[in-house]
Every structure is written in C-alpha cells, then in structure tokens.
Regions:
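Short acidic loop-to-helix transition motifs that present clustered carboxylates
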Residues: 41-43, 163-166
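General small-molecule cofactor/ligand-binding pocket signal
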Residues: 36-38, 159-163
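Ligand-binding pocket segment of bilobal, Venus flytrap-like solute-binding proteins
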Residues: 55-56, 164-198, 217, 258, ...
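Short, glycine-/small- and polar/acidic-enriched structural segments
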Residues: 4-153, 178-188, 195-208
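Conserved C-terminal helix/tail region of periplasmic/extracytoplasmic solute-binding proteins
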Residues: 307-390
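Extended ligand-binding regions for polar small-molecule ligands
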Residues: 27-29, 96-112, 211-265
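Secondary-structure end/capping motifs
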Residues: 227-333
Length: 390
C-alpha cells in the first residue's frame, strides 16, 4: 500500500511521544500515512516550519497558536489546535547556587508545595530570579507567572529568558539563568549533569495543564480534511497505547534513539513513570499524572483551556485586545476533534468547555461512549476559572 507522507515538526521532548509512537508502532501506517518527523532546534523553528508550509502539522506549545491568533509574536498565520498531545510534564528547577542557598535554610526539596517553595526562594534571592524557559509563549511562562503572582515571589520577582530545552543545563552552568521551567527529559538532564535541582513539577501549579498540542494551519485543515482525520486518529491511538504502563520500557527505548531525543532511556522513563530524581544526591519523588497522554480526556482541546491561556497572555501583553481574545478562544478546535475522532473508538465529552480548577476528584461526565471520567484540574491557589465569566 502506498502511504501518504505527512511532514511533522517536533522538538526533542518526552511529550512528543504520541507522534513518534504513531510512526514507530504502526498507527500512522494503519491510516495509510507516513509521518516524516522533523526535529527542530527551537520552538520558533517549529512555528515557522508550520506557518510557512514546510510541514503540515506540528508538536506545539499550547499557548503559541493562541498567541498568534492574538497578533503576538510577529507571525500572522492562523493555526488550529486540533488535539492536545500531552498534559503536564514540565519541571521547575534551580541552578547550583540557588540549590545550595536553599539547602542552607533547611529547604528539603519536597517537590510538591508551591507556597513553601516560593517562600524559600523569596528568602534567598537578592533580586529578580532569571528563569530559563523554552519560548515566550509557552505553558512554562504562564505557570511561572501564575505561581509568582499568587505567592511571596511576586510577578516582578522573576525575569524570563528564552533557552532551547536541550541547552538548559548549559545555560545553568554558564550562569545565564538562575532557574528554569522546562519539559522532560531536560530537567532530569540538568540534575544528572550536576547543574541543578528540581523544585516543583508543573502539575503542582495546575494539575491538568494542556502542555503541547497537535497544530495545523487552519486553511490546510479545511482543504485536507481526510488527511487531517487520518493524522488525528493515528496520534490519538498512539496516546491511548502510551497509557498502558507495560509499554514504558518500549517507549523509553524508542524515544532514546539518536534520531529522536538522544538521551538515556532511564532519563526518559523518569518522566513516563513520574518517579523523578530531584537532585544529584539521589533524592527521589513520585508524582501522579506527572505526564498524561490519554486518561481523563487528556487529548480533548477544551475551549475553556484556550480562553484561560488567552486571558493570561492578555494580562502581560497590552497589544492583545478583547476582540483578539474572542479569536484566540476559537484556536482549540473541539469541533474538528469530535468530527474526526468519532471514527476512532474515542469516548468524547459532550461539552466543549468546563470550569477550570473546579474538578477536585475523578468525575464522570456525559460523553459519546458513556464511560468518560475527567481527572482533577485544580490550580494550586484554589482559583476557579469559568469560561462563561467576562
């Protein structure tokens, strides 16, 4: 059978797994497509490859297409986020000087309490903390700002500096940044190289944050609906496959290949299992749902998530007006997700938005298959975000 090539850009991160697995484990082939996976050196490269037609789809930071719809970042192409590729998966960490200063105060790197971590940082900092992040329009930045704004650090207590994920450990060593927020495995790489320690999982700030999305150009989605559906189904089935704990070893081995992440399988397994080593001392911490690809409708692009992102962006970018917020909330395409995954045994929620922060326990919801439950989506400060509120 002749396969249709679909070029896809991605960054070398554990949360690119649904794309890699879709190709490597035959889910793409079953849909009659072959994913041409193109590793990019930076998120701006991923954006540009998609925006200017070098690729048809991309592994993308969830706030990036929203920011583009708001006229931020200088690239005007309209993108659609047709699926969420991953939920959570980031780590917040500090370089060696901050780690040593924190330990002198008795801080034990519990890896779970955002208020305690912020209070400890406030005690030892002498000025704004420079955080390395992968891109200005990223969940990393939004989580850092949300955390700092609600704690002792304060929104003026951090400065943001862009560092490509694979270079985060080098930036710490050079003293270019004091701390970081990055996707795995690059936080664990910094720990393994003795360049820093992990302070918090991103999930400690918002415990069901949409991290990466499957993004396509809006016009491509309209002109290639059949191809889009085949791509979405292959990736969704890969995410479902990844939800089985028994496939972790296979996944780690595949992702560790030089063609993909080119780091040890053991480091990749830390993210997949949620068993993270937070310092070179060997201190280990377990985080439930550290990185989620499937359960709890993880892949569903909720319009409430896109509105939360848009409002966060508007708060820090004065050129993102209310009219642009309306356009931005249409970037997460629940309609396309529902249309194309009706053919993939997916149990999809009947609603397209939810109240972010309100789900405290596993909660059954009305769905196409009648068996769907959503996972907790709390913010650490107990804030509730209702999309219907202006």
């Amino acid at each position: 059978m002749s396969l249709v090539a679909v070029p896809v850009a991605y960054m070398p991160l554990v949360d690119a797994a649904p794309l890699i697995i879709a190709q490597e484990m035959g889910f793409a082939k079953a849909e009659g497509i072959a994913l041409e996976l193109i590793a990019a050196p930076s998120w701006s490269s991923v954006r540009d490859m998609l925006a200017f037609g070098r690729v048809d789809a991309a592994h993308m930071l969830s706030p990036l297409p929203v920011a583009m719809a708001m006229g931020l970042g200088g690239v005007a192409t309209t993108l659609s986020a047709v699926s969420v590729l991953s939920v959570n998966g980031n780590v917040i960490g500090v370089g060696k000087p901050l780690e040593e200063a924190l330990r002198k105060t008795g801080f034990d790197f519990d890896f779970k309490d955002p208020f305690r971590a912020a209070k400890a940082l406030q005690k030892v900092r002498s000025g704004p903390l420079i955080f390395g992040v992968p891109f200005p329009f990223s969940m990393h930045v939004e989580l850092l700002r949300y955390w700092s704004q609600a704690t002792a650090i304060g929104v003026d207590g951090i400065e943001i500096r862009t560092v490509p994920p694979p270079l985060m450990a080098s930036a710490l060593e050079a003293g270019d940044v004091d701390a970081f927020c990055v996707g795995e495995p690059w936080g664990s790489v910094a720990v393994e190289q003795g360049k820093g320690a992990l302070l918090l999982p991103g999930a400690a700030i918002w415990n069901f944050a949409p991290e990466k999305v499957l993004a396509v150009r809006k016009d491509w989605a309209e002109t290639e609906p059949n191809l889009l559906g085949r791509l979405m189904r292959a990736v969704w089935r890969a995410g479902r496959w990844l939800s089985d704990p028994d496939v972790r070893a296979t996944t780690s081995d595949l992702l560790s290949r030089k063609a993909y992440l080119d780091v040890s399988a053991e480091l990749i397994d830390r993210a997949l299992s949620g068993h993270l080593m937070v310092s070179e001392r060997g201190e280990q911490r377990k985080v439930d749902q550290f990185l989620e690809f499937h359960f709890g409708a993880a892949s569903f692009p909720w319009t409430s998530q896109s509105k939360w992102i848009a409002q966060q962006l508007q708060q820090f970018h004065s050129d993102g007006g209310s009219c642009k917020i309306d356009a931005a909330t249409k970037v997460f395409r629940a309609d396309l997700h529902r249309r194309h995954l009706n053919f993939a045994e997916a149990d999809l929620p009947n609603a397209s938005d939810k109240i972010e922060g309100a789900i405290r326990h596993v909660t059954p919801v009305a769905s196409s298959g009648g068996l769907l439950s959503l996972l907790p989506n709390q913010f650490f400060d107990a804030h509730i975000f209702d999309k219907s509120e202006k």
